[in-house]
């Protein structure tokens, strides 16, 4: 009886101490949006972007946050292949073929 109690207690302790996988994003990855490398990142209300928004038919008042300009996707992070010689950002909307990306947040690829 004492042996059975010991076995049950030991198994319960092992089960409680077993590590579980955490679903946290890796360094240099985006929890929302896509990882992009943009030549410049500017505020949406920047005067230099106003004419570009007009050409794309975007209403300036509807755009908030940071805007990436001339962006390309970063595909390999952490394997020595992720390089961005400009500004790495996570962007929510890159539906303008890399010309601009909307809703960007700067990130650090060197973590």
UniProtKB/Swiss-Prot annotation:
Function recorded in the entry: Aerial growth, conidiation, and dispersal of filamentous fungi in the environment rely upon a capability of their secreting small amphipathic proteins called hydrophobins (HPBs) with low sequence identity. Class I can self-assemble into an outermost layer of rodlet bundles on aerial cell surfaces, conferring cellular hydrophobicity that supports fungal growth, development and dispersal; whereas Class II form highly ordered films at water-air interfaces through intermolecular interactions but contribute nothing to the rodlet structure.
Location(s) in or outside the cell: Secreted; Secreted, Cell wall
GO molecular function list: structural constituent of cell wall
GO terms under cellular component: extracellular region; fungal-type cell wall
The organism of origin for this protein: Pleurotus ostreatus (strain PC15) (Oyster mushroom)
Protein name as catalogued: Class I hydrophobin 10
InterPro entries according to UniProt: Hydrophobin
Keywords recorded for this protein, A-Z: Cell wall, Disulfide bond, Secreted, Signal
Family to which this protein belongs: Belongs to the fungal hydrophobin family.
Subunit organization: Self-assembles to form functional amyloid fibrils called rodlets. Self-assembly into fibrillar rodlets occurs spontaneously at hydrophobic:hydrophilic interfaces and the rodlets further associate laterally to form amphipathic monolayers.
Protein's UniProt keywords contain Disulfide bond: yes
Secreted in keyword set: yes
Signal peptide extent: 1-17
Gene designation: Hydph10
Cystine connections: 30-90, 37-84, 38-71, 91-104
């Amino acid at each position: 009886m004492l042996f059975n109690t010991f076995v049950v207690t030991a198994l319960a302790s092992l089960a409680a101490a077993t590590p579980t996988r955490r679903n946290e994003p890796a360094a240099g990855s985006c929890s929302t949006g896509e990882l992009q490398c943009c030549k410049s990142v500017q505020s949406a209300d920047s005067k230099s972007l106003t004419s570009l928004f007009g050409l794309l038919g975007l209403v300036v008042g509807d755009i908030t946050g940071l805007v990436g300009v001339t962006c390309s996707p970063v595909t390999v992070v952490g394997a020595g292949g992720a390089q961005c010689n400009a500004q790495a950002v996570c962007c929510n909307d890159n539906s303008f073929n890399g010309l601009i990306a909307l809703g960007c947040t700067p990130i650090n690829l060197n973590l």
